[in-house]
A protein has these predicted regions:
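HIT superfamily nucleotide-processing domains
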Residues: 1-114
C-alpha cells in the first residue's frame, strides 16, 4: 500500500533483537542508517516514517517459527508534499498502489547513501 514501504528481515533465523550477535547488531544499525539516509535523499527532506520491529509474543510459550523483522511505512508518495492517505476503499476493500514496489525499490537503490 505504501509506495516506499520496506520490510527488513534477518538473514539468519533470529526471533528477537537480544538474540542478535554483536556483528548482527552492528549490521542492523548499518542497514537502518543506510535506509533512512536514502529515504532522506529521495525528496531531499527529512523523510517521515513509522517503523516497528516484530518479535514473538512474551507469554512464555515457544515460537520456534517466529522470524525477527521490521516494517517501515513512509507516507510520502511522489514528492515531499504529496502524502499517501489510506481512504475508504483501501481500508475496507482493495489497496491501491500509485507506484509499484519494484519502481519504488529501484528509486531507493539508485540514491547515494551520503
Amino acid at each position: 500500500v505504501w509506495p516506499f514501504e520496506t520490510l527488513l528481515l534477518a538473514r539468519a533465523h533470529r526471533d528477537t533483537l537480544p538474540a542478535l550477535s554483536g556483528p548482527e547488531r552492528d549490521a542492523l544499525a548499518d542497514i537502518l542508517g543506510r535506509l533512512t539516509r536514502r529515504y532522506n535523499r529521495l525528496f531531499d527532506v527529512p523523510f517521515p516514517y513509522s517503523m516497528g520491529f516484530h518479535q514473538p509474543p512474551t507469554d512464555g510459550a515457544a515460537y520456534p517459527a517466529w522470524h525477527l523483522h521490521a516494517h517501515f511505512y513512509p507516507p510520502l508518495l511522489r514528492s515531499a508534499t504529496v502524502r499517501k492517505f489510506m481512504v475508504g476503499y483501501e481500508l475496507l476493500g482493495q489497496p491501491q498502489r500509485d507506484i509499484t514496489p519494484e519502481s519504488a525499490a529501484a528509486r531507493l537503490r539508485e540514491l547515494p547513501e551520503e
